[in-house]
Amino acid sequence: MSNLSVNAIRFLGIDAINKANSGHPGVVMGAAPMAYNLFTKELRINPAQPNWINRDRFILSAGHGSMLLYALLHLSGFEDVSMDEVKNFRQWGSKTPGHPEFGHTAGVDATTGPLGQGIATATGFAQAERFLAAKYNREGYNIFDHYTYVICGDGDLMEGVSSEAASYAGLQKLDKLVVLYDSNDINLDGETKDSFTESVRDRYNAYGWHTALVEDGTDLEAIQAAIEEAKASGKPSLIEVKTVIGYGSPNKQGTNAVHGAPLGSDETAATRQALGWNYEPFEIPAEVYADFKENVADRGASAYEAWTKLVADYKEAHPELAAEVEAIIDGRDPVELTPDDFPALENGFSQATRNSSQDALNVVATKLPTFLGGSADLAHSNMTYIKTDGLQDDANRLNRNIQFGVREFAMGTVLNGMALHGGLRVYGGTFFVFSDYLKAAVRLSALQGLPVTYVFTHDSIAVGEDGPTHEPVEHLAGLRAIPNLNVFRPADARETQAAWYQAVKSEKTPTVLVLTRQNLTVEEGTDFDKVAKGAYVVYENATDFDTILIATGSEVNLAVAAAKELASQGGKVRVVSMPSTDVFDAQDTAYKEEILPNAVRRRVAVEMGATQNWYKYVGLDGAVLGIDTFGASAPASKVLAEYGFTVENLVKIINNLK
């Protein structure tokens, strides 16, 4: 029976890829046995309840092998992946896109495809499960109790982010993380002997992982024994499974020819004969469906039913905790954050927005028990520390400060995994200039609709002495270009509070907070509530103004000072604080006209970053005071003056406009 089901997985993949004339059959054919074993013997999922929070998670880190996952989901009974959807693989509007997409297809636990990120994301799943189990489980009531499984390939393990995350997972002793390594000695360009020769198991042993070798990737009993051994090891586990890419293809197996191209009709026919598969394309024997129903769907439904009874009993035994758990199950925060939770701030109060952020995130941490995060070895510079808690590790699972180490990319992907798991609000910090290290993770936050908060400090050339390697220039423009990402650069402590509030209330959009090292003064006109609009009027000395200054972050203080100088010269000026261009762009036309009336063409935008994004606001008649070169090393006041960020220069630019 098992051989028939394994071949059903293979040929669903082969046939769908042939029909699409696009895809990667090699991994489907080679990894089918381990995937079959995982789904029918280990993975505890319920196709009728695909979002069950205590299900085991499965991450196909080798996302190019998506038909392996779709075949498994179809056979297991997930409604989203009907046979029609299998036949529509890689077609417009289908539930079976080229790489798995979270939120698009039920049963897909994470968006994968960029290699390495799946392993790192799985690390976040495992850490989320551990925290929630420590917080809410009680004797006899293991409400959160599941494993996270991964299938990865050689390419995943070559990527640096998997190494960062594996080092971190070993440090954290995340023992419910099990990675199955599809080790087939082939990559797209040829054989791995030309590009990847270290002992992966030795490397992972050094990270603090349990490792094992299955020498025959078709030996289901050996695979099963290795998984059971891994689960009992008390460590994260890597099981190297030696496979043959394109297994069963007489002329292509074991070569890179089967990695990323359809088999074609002739080789498919030969493979059918070689594997004894006497069925038409997309024809699946009833016995295979029965196998998956009994060993995946029915087994999972029984586990789900037992768990729901456990939760009901838990509500009786622990009603206060159960109320929080019920909110988590429903996808809500266990406690609601409100604007009134943040203290009022006096005008004129001066503080760096990184410090304002520290104050605000501690307000959030006090209110929300499931709010946690950390920094890439910069907590005391990013000001990301929750003051009531210590560091989280295996011995202190309830602490909410996470020390990611100098692993920015892994930090972003781990945060994604924690957010994907559900039940948590998470954040991570580093210097803004180092956001490039984790930009690929930020992009996947946005693509997956995950409300992760990124805290990026030291936001401009005002860093000063550290010089151009540490002074962001192009970073704001780059992050603003990512769809479904809200970038906030607050002007003062009040706007920083509001930006944090917007971040925590977000459901489907990640947030970037871009914060200063230098002190900024709370302006009289900044407004907590209006930050929700992305831009608003912060200063105006006449209702018939003829000049608009648009500024973000630290430049709002500069713009207001320049406006007051212009006012003393008889100028009529409006200053607009635009903490988030993304949020402002989403407002309706009427609000945009209210803030930036088309009739007023005399406009200047002020921001210590690349200028290109600002011309859509100032137009051809306006001007931009920005930076399109790298920064410099000197005291901040000298750097700012040399780059023209002074009241005198800004007034001059405005007066030179027609």
Predicted feature locations:
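A short, small-residue-rich loop immediately preceding and capping a beta-strand
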Residues: 20, 56-57, 108-111, 141-159, ...
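Non-catalytic terminal/interface segments that mediate subunit docking, oligomerization
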Residues: 309-451, 528-536, 543-544, 550-553, ...
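A glycine-rich helix N-cap at a beta->alpha junction
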Residues: 78-89, 170-182, 205-209, 446-461, ...
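A short glycine/serine-rich beta->alpha loop
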Residues: 16-25, 53-61, 104-116, 345-349, ...
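N-terminal capping segment at the start of a domain
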Residues: 8-22, 182-183
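Cofactor-binding active-site loop characterized by glycine-rich and histidine/acidic residues
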Residues: 30-171, 385-386, 414, 418, ...
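Thiamine diphosphate
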Residues: 91-103, 127, 131-134, 140-145, ...
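Terminal amphipathic helices with adjacent charged low-complexity linkers/tails
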Residues: 53-54, 240-249, 253-333
